[in-house]
Amino acid sequence: MPDTIQEVLQAFASGELVVVTDDEDREGEGDLIVAASLCTPEKMAFIIRHTSGIVCAPITTEDARRLRLDPMVAHNESNHTTAFTVSIDYKPDGGTGISAEERASCCRALANPNAGANDFARPGHIFPLIARDGGVLLRSGHTEAAVDLCKLSGLPPVGVISELMNDDGTVMKGEQVARFASSHKLKHVTIADMIAYRQAREKLIERVATFTTDSPIGPLQGYAYRSPFDEIAHVAFVYNGVGDGKNVLTRFHKPNIVRDIFTGQKRMLTVLEHFKKSGRGVLVYLRDGAAGVPVAPLPQEKSAEADRNRQWREVGVGAQILRDLGVTSIRHLTSSVHDYKGLSGFGIEIVSNEQLEV
């Protein structure tokens, strides 16, 4: 069973190795991760012994530019767009670069802000990976998880990661990963838990405008929001205020250009009539394909990662908009049944799901 984020961060900040597992519909695999600044030869030897031996070092875009670490290939065709740079060794070590001591030294040098591009030989035995800005909130991969763990622990944002393997050469998955973490007394966390932790503690939206607009049921108060992840504004429309913020009838709207143009008016009128009957209501309009907070069901095709990452962001953006409006619990007006996860982390409760029939 995964440990709490707080337990993992405490262990990570003290230089311990931790195990991080991603989603089953992505890879379902576990990586050993340690902060590069605290990586010792002993920890590197443990990593090499229990993993594929391909040791990677997640870094930020800023550090990659500073150290002139160019992409390994011009056109990335990997299944999960893992951003490999050219491989490196640390020149001052002077050896082949393959030993645990030399690889640990190279990783520590990557985390040293005083190190420069000329301190590293190319190619080498450490494989830097460029993490997406925004971390696990933008890409739910081990690369981003490693950098996020460093940042959340107050350490230089460079990690060391490698994928856990069984003795027969197969990749560890699921319960195998959990048993490994338990047998070696390593803290274990999922990327999903890291996403939820960040969402509940970071401000993902900013109110940028307030306005009033007319509607068939009377004036609506509009609130426009921006997030770091979207170029366009999200909007919430409030009918008759939210009062004490409890049991507020709420509709999350998923934009669909064709539907909204040709059949959307009837649906919106029905939503507004429900608001009028209830006496108050909130319509959260998350643009650019955002639907609100549904996490399941998810698309089954391999391209689902982008959809899943977007939906994780919607959990935070949609919930934080409600929180900004003073809403603490909602009656969810929905035309389909979803599994809504993540709202409770923002102090928002779904009291009921009420069917929207058009």
Regions found by a protein language model. Give the residues of each.
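Catalytic domains of riboflavin
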Residues: 1-358
